[in-house]
Swiss-Prot record:
Organism, scientific name: Phasmahyla jandaia (Jandaia leaf frog)
Superkingdom: Eukaryota
One term under GO cellular component: extracellular region
Major localization listed first in the record, in broad terms: secreted
Family membership noted in the UniProt record: Belongs to the frog skin active peptide (FSAP) family. Phylloseptin subfamily.
Function: Has antimicrobial activity.
Lineage summary: Eukaryota, Metazoa, Chordata, Craniata, Vertebrata
Keywords: Amidation, Amphibian defense peptide, Antimicrobial, Secreted
UniProt protein name: Phylloseptin-J4
Tissue: Expressed by the skin glands.
GO biological process, one term: defense response
UniProt keyword Secreted, yes or no: yes
Amino acid sequence: FLSLIPHAINAISAIAHHL
């Protein structure tokens, strides 16, 4: 689960940057 957190943060960051 801890290994999935950075991936989720990276995805959210990418979405925020795209907006």
